[in-house]
Curated annotation (Swiss-Prot):
Enzyme class: transferase
Record's protein name: UDP-3-O-acylglucosamine N-acyltransferase
Gene that this polypeptide is encoded by: lpxD
Active site (record annotation): 245
Reactions this protein catalyses: a UDP-3-O-[(3R)-3-hydroxyacyl]-alpha-D-glucosamine + a (3R)-hydroxyacyl-[ACP] = a UDP-2-N,3-O-bis[(3R)-3-hydroxyacyl]-alpha-D-glucosamine + holo-[ACP] + H(+)
Keyword hit for Lipid biosynthesis: yes
Subunit record text: Homotrimer.
Similarity remark: Belongs to the transferase hexapeptide repeat family. LpxD subfamily.
Listed pathway(s): Bacterial outer membrane biogenesis; LPS lipid A biosynthesis
One Pfam family matching this protein: LpxD
Molecular function in Gene Ontology: N-acyltransferase activity
Species whose genome carries this gene: Anaeromyxobacter dehalogenans (strain 2CP-1 / ATCC BAA-258)
Key words of the record: Acyltransferase, Lipid A biosynthesis, Lipid biosynthesis, Lipid metabolism, Repeat, Transferase
Function summary: Catalyzes the N-acylation of UDP-3-O-acylglucosamine using 3-hydroxyacyl-ACP as the acyl donor. Is involved in the biosynthesis of lipid A, a phosphorylated glycolipid that anchors the lipopolysaccharide to the outer membrane of the cell.
Length: 354
């Protein structure tokens, strides 16, 4: 198992040691579980009690964090980012073992780089390409004419359908499907003499996944009706997300679990959509937009805006509306009382109701 001195870790993440820089650490653990030979991190004030009680040999903290005398810490500008980098040192990514398992199925016209690893029961179809050092876990299917770049990891039962293209350093979690048919049907009231039917619109486009993308388990990215559905460089998509045909997801965007994006909508760079947010089709969502969890986005959103609610409105307006909900019952009672009082005054004055 790898071990590092605290000073070595500081050099790797650009931090400053307070305490014993020669302290050797052999792992990283949560504050509550870390031992004297492990490092932990503290970036959320909710966990201050755990931080103060932690037995960790060292803790990653940010520059303004107050610490008790004698506590060994590694101060960094961004504790969570430093945690990620340190964790990667202790748990480096899996490296490909160049081999093709005997039960893997590689079509004679497929091109699999000699340094790639193809595990049992994985399948690479006709004219497909798999790049250097890419790992295909059991059950992966790379279909006809698909292109897979270098240093990718496709976990169990991933499907990349025909003619789709995946860039370099892409991670596809178990069960995700790239290039499933888009949901396109034209209603035919006659049904060619057989009665009304939904006529399937052929989905003949593809999907392009750019470099450094990660797609979560059981997420589906549908192929375009015509043209390309595109996931931009560095985007991260959580589990159980639905990306419809011809959607464009901008670089560095984050889509949290159960988000749904309907057809032909374009998300700009760095868009963040909270869990279960739904975005209807044919919209333009600008760069840097933030969408609250469970929001229903029904209209274009300008760059930099934050929206919440269903239908989604500017976040400040939504907060005001939510704050009013607790008072609606009392307001209703007051309104009824005022109405009765007005009716009484009109009756006393002999006025008819308007």
């Amino acid at each position: 198992m790898a071990s590092y001195t605290l000073a070595e870790l500081a050099a790797r993440v650009g931090g400053a040691v307070e305490g014993d820089g020669s302290l050797r650490l052999d792992g990283i653990s949560p504050l509550e579980e870390a031992s004297a030979s492990e490092i932990s991190f503290f970036s959320n004030r909710k966990y201050r009690k755990a931080f103060e009680a932690s037995r960790a040999g060292a803790v990653v903290v940010e520059p303004d964090e107050q610490v008790a005398a004698g506590r060994t810490v590694l101060r960094v500008a961004n504790a969570y980012l430093a945690f990620a980098k340190i964790s990667t040192l202790f748990h480096p990514p899996r490296e490909a073992v160049p081999e093709v398992a005997p039960t893997a199925v590689i079509h004679p016209t497929a091109r699999v780089h000699p340094s790639a690893q193809v595990m049992p029961l994985a399948c690479v179809g006709p004219d497909a390409q798999v790049g250097a050092r890419t790992i295909l876990f059991p059950g992966v299917h790379v279909a006809d004419g698909a292109r897979v770049g270098e240093d990718c990891v496709f976990y169990h039962n991933v499907v990349v359908r025909e003619r789709c293209a995946v860039g370099n350093r892409v991670i596809l979690q178990p069960g995700c499907v790239i290039g499933s048919d888009g949901f396109g049907f034209a209603f035919d009231p006659e049904g060619e003499g057989k009665g009304p039917r939904h006529y399937k619109v052929p989905q003949v486009g593809n999907v392009v996944i750019e470099d450094d993308v990660e797609v979560g388990a059981n997420t589906c990215v549908d192929r375009a009706t015509l043209g390309t559905t595109r996931i931009g460089r560095g985007a991260k998509i959580d589990n159980l997300v639905q990306i419809a045909h011809n959607v464009q997801v901008g670089p560095l965007s984050l889509l949290v679990s159960q988000v749904g994006v309907a057809g032909s909508t374009k998300l700009g760079m760095g868009v963040v959509a909270g869990g279960q947010a739904g975005i209807v089709g044919h919209l333009e969502i600008g760069d840097g937009v933030r969408i609250g969890a469970q929001s229903g986005v029904m209209a274009d959103v300008e760059a930099g805006e934050t929206v919440s609610g269903s239908p989604a409105v500017p976040h400040g307006n939504w907060l005001k509306a939510m704050a009013s909900l607790d008072h609606l019952h009392d307001m209703r009672k007051e309104l009824r009382s005022l109405r009765r009082e007005v009716e009484r005054l009109r009756a006393d004055a002999g006025e008819d109701e308007p």
